[in-house]
Amino acid sequence: MPSPKLSSLILAPIAAVAFLASCAPSAPGGERHGAASSALTAQARLTACEQDPRVVAGLVTREICAGADIFFRETFEGNGRSCGTCHPVENNFTIDIPFIDTLIDNNPLDPLFIFEQEPELEELETFELKTLGLIRVNIDGYDDLDNKYVMRGVPHTLSMATTIAPDPANGTEGVPVHRTGWSGDGAPGSGSLREFLTGAITQHFPTDLGREPGVAFRLPTEDELDLTLAYQMSLGRTNELDLTQVSLTDPEANEGRLAFLDPARGRCNVCHSNAGANHLDSGLNRNLDTGTRTAPASGTIGAFDGGFGGKDQAEPNLDVIGLGFKHGFGDGTFNVPPIIEAVDTPPFFHTNAFGPDIEGAVAFYISNQFKQSPAGQELEARFGAPIAFPDSDIVKIGRFLRVLSAAFNVDLARQRLDAALVLVNRFHDSSADVQERLMKLADVELDDALQVLAVGGTPLHPASRDRLRLAKAEIAAGLTATRWSQRQGRLAAAISRVKVARDQFGSNITYRLGKGNLMD
């Protein structure tokens, strides 16, 4: 048993700790975090986090803990939304149609749908949030709300430590200092990820569309900006793979790896080096015009999304979709996302118009739409021929990416299960709620891995999928356990099952994971 002193520390009934500990996640689409514009200051959150068992055990820093609390629960005196409203941890930090449909059924008054509940916010979103998963974004400014907006999918917030350093090759050195959002210019001010929070509050949190700070919302403090940044930079993975050293046990997946790397076949590695978001030449994130802008999913005026750099344009400067006249703002380029995380966050690209599976996104790159785009033409000039690969390579590249994604999912699950076991060993039942939350989030990641590995044709790692199902059964049993020792045994068994499943994928698929993955 933990010492009486330690038990009293963890269970201390102070208001701040109760606030932090009372907000467990549930199944996607169910009752979500109790977001509120609280009286907690950043310092109060830091103090409360000193008593979080994950911090006490050294699994998470108090800064990451406090940043997560802001991310998921602080509404900044706005309309009830938090960052977690559109970036739920239970759904890979994004929203999609299945998630939205379930949320409509389970909680139709969720703040995501505030535009249907408050007349003054009717134009905050459009009906396409529910039908296409697209949100309304005034990326080019708020001077013409009726006409100057775009419709975009919600990008996940995973692994941003690897994706936001801008490539000077775009000719935009200086501002923005980070590549954020779908067009790489999503943050106000200097364009930093730190300042992205200010832009998100202004865009998505207001109580009215006048968006006056201090009236429609409050701005974050300097400490809140710092803490939220610390949390976001600790999500997902913090390293890149070396695909030349990776070897996959599934023959078709490994052949897909070779096609991905081969400039005579996929050429994927040029713009998505090591299946990440950075360019091969620089190791930095580059904006590209790949032609996805010419096929929007949306039929509203917001479909005319010109991408990067539209904010300073007084009049439309770009023919976005080939109408013969200028109707969009920007230079046509968009931010390159990491592929490892993209596999289980469909649909794809900023328009949500491609998918539903990763193979659909791969197939886009042999379409005329891509070949005729500036990015496609650049690759043709570089290698002396248009990009071309057979349909069989679409399947193989898809299998390769699915294995990388499943390995990432399994590693996230393992990280959370390991943390839960540390807590049960140290604190026994005194932190059971946190242990169980970690177990539930691990279970969600195992579901993702199983879904990613479930492909048509030749089965992809059937033995691993069996082990993952057994691990899920151990987690389920652990969640119903009445004593810590029972939960301890189930966790150990689940970890063993997960390890065996993961080992069968291949070698050198090594992810370093951020500590923020343990928060919710």
Which residues fall in each region the model found?
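Bacterial N-terminal signal peptides that target proteins for export
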Residues: P2-P13
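N-terminal Sec signal peptide cleavage junction
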Residues: C23-P25
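Periplasmic c-type cytochrome electron-transfer domains
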Residues: E31-D520
